[in-house]
Amino acid sequence: MNRPVHNEHRRKRFAKKCPFVSAGWKTIDYKDVTTLKRFITERGKILPRRITGVSSRFQALLAQAVKRARHVGLLPFVGED
């Protein structure tokens, strides 16, 4: 038995461009809190690549910068409720 294919349930996936690559960034500074907050949820979690469109290299640099900013005290470990 084959299932009927419903076209309304299929979604086209668009290739997301990495904002850091398109802007020409080489590294991510942990002191740039406004940029880091764009990639963090309200709860303080780092957003995944599939949502943000960040490349794998910059996702690793982003995670490292967020963790450094948390330890220094620039970003909270847990977001406000």
UniProtKB/Swiss-Prot annotation:
A GO molecular-function annotation: structural constituent of ribosome
Keyword rRNA processing tagged: no
Stored Pfam families: Ribosomal_S18
Bilayer-crossing regions: none
Biological process terms in GO annotation: translation
Cystines in this chain: none
A Gene Ontology term for the protein's cellular component: cytosolic small ribosomal subunit
InterPro entries associated with the record: Ribosomal_bS18 (IPR001648), Ribosomal_bS18_CS (IPR018275), Ribosomal_bS18_sf (IPR036870)
Entry keywords, A to Z: Ribonucleoprotein, Ribosomal protein, RNA-binding, rRNA-binding
Function statement: Binds as a heterodimer with protein bS6 to the central domain of the 16S rRNA, where it helps stabilize the platform of the 30S subunit.
Family classification: Belongs to the bacterial ribosomal protein bS18 family.
Binding partners and assembly: Part of the 30S ribosomal subunit. Forms a tight heterodimer with protein bS6.
UniProt protein name: Small ribosomal subunit protein bS18
Gene from which this protein is expressed: rpsR
